[in-house]
Amino acid sequence: MLKKISFKKLELKPELENKNESTIIPCAPKELLLICPKCKKTLLKSELADNLDVCRECGYHFRISARKRIGITVDNETFVEYDRELRSKNILNFPGYDEKLKTAIKENGENEAVICGIGKIEGFECAIFAMEPFFMMGSMGCVVGEKIARLFELATDKSIPVIGFTVSGGARMQEGIMSLMQMAKISGAVKRHSNNGNLYVAVLTDPTTGGVTASFAMQGDIIVSEPDTLIGFAGPRVIEQTIRRSLPDGFQRAEFLMERGFLDSIVGRNELKKYLGNILMLHNVEAR
């Protein structure tokens, strides 16, 4: 039930105040509204959720959790999660890492920055992973790499496609070189999956950067992106500081990359499930 909207009197300067009138403005609770960062319009959170967290005014795609991503993409009651119990450890005794992990687990309710499993999309069975942007910015550590590599190996054994939703700030610095090794490990699993004639569709969401972009995010047979997704290795500011030149408008955004052949398609969130279902159908995946 919605809370009763409160009002407060607008304080006016003496020279502007009308003795016979009082002015009031609505003061809505913060839990009901938010501001779109792109068009600056005020949005009802309930209406935004009904539209899959896409702004109806400008089409801005808000970031969503991995659990919600799977919920809006996979057919009801078909998803079976794998390796949920795996958790990262502070193998390098990096200062503050244990506390960051505990906080991330408590705030997100997830054990790691990726969810992996098998389900159906429009009736077609596939392996699915979705990275979690709210768990240490979707950073890739040993457990993230292990879970995704295991999923590709499982998909290879079952001869089913993989649909992967990427969102990440890159390799997890608290795990040092071990996090970078996950790039090679996952890439090897992707290659074996491909060598067996299986399909891999990578869906890039905002932002997909760092070691994730430099490995499995760009290894898909078909590479799709949501609109206006930031895709790159180093960030724009780092590049500008390095080359000491201004970057072109839209640099590293999905539309910029699409024009230059790095992407196969840009698909809005509302159309994505149907789009993926059509791809699975066209690649002769048996519906069950």
Swiss-Prot record:
Q: How is the cofactor bound?
A: Binds 1 zinc ion per subunit.
**What does UniProt give as GO cellular component?**
acetyl-CoA carboxylase complex
Tell me which residues make up the CoA carboxyltransferase N-terminal domain: 32-288
Q: Name one GO molecular function term.
A: ATP binding
Catalysed reactions, as listed in the record: N(6)-carboxybiotinyl-L-lysyl-[protein] + acetyl-CoA = N(6)-biotinyl-L-lysyl-[protein] + malonyl-CoA
What function does the entry list? Answer: Component of the acetyl coenzyme A carboxylase (ACC) complex. Biotin carboxylase (BC) catalyzes the carboxylation of biotin on its carrier protein (BCCP) and then the CO(2) group is transferred by the transcarboxylase to acetyl-CoA to form malonyl-CoA.
Kinase listed as a keyword: no
Q: Which UniProt keywords apply?
A: ATP-binding, Cytoplasm, Fatty acid biosynthesis, Fatty acid metabolism, Lipid biosynthesis, Lipid metabolism, Metal-binding, Nucleotide-binding, Transferase, Zinc, Zinc-finger
Biological or metabolic pathway of the protein: Lipid metabolism; malonyl-CoA biosynthesis; malonyl-CoA from acetyl-CoA: step 1/1
Question: So where does Zn(2+) get bound?
Answer: 36, 39, 55, 58
Full protein name: Acetyl-coenzyme A carboxylase carboxyl transferase subunit beta
Spell out the InterPro entries in the cross-references. AcCoA_carboxyl_beta, Acetyl_CoA_COase_Trfase_b_su, ClpP/crotonase-like_dom_sf, COA_CT_N, Znf-ACC
Zn-finger regions (C4-type) at which positions? 36-58
GO terms for biological process, alphabetical: fatty acid biosynthetic process; malonyl-CoA biosynthetic process
**Which EC number applies?**
2.1.3.15
Assembly: Acetyl-CoA carboxylase is a heterohexamer composed of biotin carboxyl carrier protein (AccB), biotin carboxylase (AccC) and two subunits each of ACCase subunit alpha (AccA) and ACCase subunit beta (AccD).
Please state which protein family the record places this protein in: Belongs to the AccD/PCCB family.
Name the source organism: Ruminiclostridium cellulolyticum (strain ATCC 35319 / DSM 5812 / JCM 6584 / H10)
Give the top-level enzyme category.
Answer: transferase
Give the subcellular location.
Answer: Cytoplasm
PROSITE patterns in the cross-refs: COA_CT_NTER
